[in-house]
Amino acid sequence: MKSNNALIVILGTVTLDAVGIGLVMPVLPGLLRDIVHSDSIASHYGVLLALYALMQFLCAPVLGALSDRFGRRPVLLASLLGATIDYAIMATTPVLWILYAGRIVAGITGATGAVAGAYIADITDGEDRARHFGLMSACFGVGMVAGPVAGGLLGAISLHAPFLAAAVLNGLNLLLGCFLMQESHKGERRPMPLRAFNPVSSFRWARGMTIVAALMTVFFIMQLVGQVPAALWVIFGEDRFRWSATMIGLSLAVFGILHALAQAFVTGPATKRFGEKQAIIAGMAADALGYVLLAFATRGWMAFPIMILLASGGIGMPALQAMLSRQVDDDHQGQLQGSLAALTSLTSITGPLIVTAIYAASASTWNGLAWIVGAALYLVCLPALRRGAWSRATST
């Protein structure tokens, strides 16, 4: 099944899923203030964020493997049903252990990015995959911009309103999938080994595949570097530019919009014109240059033109995903996408800890060091990019 209708449905599902995730983020600290002692809010908030990323790391490979066996549609629908029930319970039961349990369930059901990626690989011809992966990233980005904005507005009415809205949104997403989503991969009714449920073992399938292993290493590094702005943007903006909360929110919205536009309208043409390899290199170069410029920026307005570079750097990841998806057959797309989603979640757990530690250690002397370290990490990708196998994995 290779139709535009299928692509529209899965992109709509990804967008609504991202909005649902973003809806609850602005109110989590406020909700914690209502149910725990004020001195422990920061620690609880950090644990809740880490729990979400940890569950995605543990469950993304499993969901990907399940979708290879049973098909993409039932796994996606089951996850959406679980998310709907989870958000509905959290909206009506303001108890700390329920909040923790809810973030665990949300992390499990939010690991569907792997299945969505496999779905797109199923319905897309090789030459269009980079563009369609870019569209998927753009839709997720749009949802993550719209979700927090809507969550903040609803949170002003009630701290529980965003959770209720997320439940409704996931319910609508479930209905969309039930009536409009077609199966893209019938699956193989073969037994699932126990190692499929081990997130570490889920990477072993790539050990004998030189190209895949090298490209997954590049993927991990790129995702790790991407954690630098995620972890530092707010605190760096406050310390370096003296930005207010309103200004920080505005800058995040602008960056989200620019990133979505680049993913939607630049990735496809750039990949078709220059090839996947050059698109990846160009993305890393733009990102690294943006980091270096931010490290030395002295005025808040300078960050906004630099955002264009950072957004342009986003073209590299969809090109890399497309390249990776062509290295495995259709029956293992879910396993591949699950491994990639697990790597992303792993960087979401470790990246902020590493980046903020560097920032804290250097802030008293020069708070731009973490950006330079992030840019330098791209150099680690060069050995993988120079491998002889790399040239065989690219298309022009």
Swiss-Prot record:
Q: Where in the cell is it found?
A: Cell inner membrane
The entry's biotechnology remark is:
This protein is used as a marker in many commonly used cloning vectors, such as pBR322 and pACYC184.
* Keywords (A to Z) from UniProt: Antibiotic resistance, Antiport, Cell inner membrane, Cell membrane, Hydrogen ion transport, Ion transport, Membrane, Plasmid, Transmembrane, Transmembrane helix, Transport
Annotated GO CC locations: plasma membrane
Disulfide bridges in this chain: none
Pfam families (UniProt xref):
MFS_1
Tell me which Gene Ontology terms the entry assigns under biological process. Answer: proton transmembrane transport; response to antibiotic
Molecular function via GO? antiporter activity
Please list the residue ranges that the record places on the Periplasmic side of the membrane: 28-45, 101-103, 160, 232-246, 299, 361-364
Q: Principal localization?
A: membrane
Similarity section: Belongs to the major facilitator superfamily. TCR/Tet family.
Q: What is this protein called?
A: Tetracycline resistance protein, class C
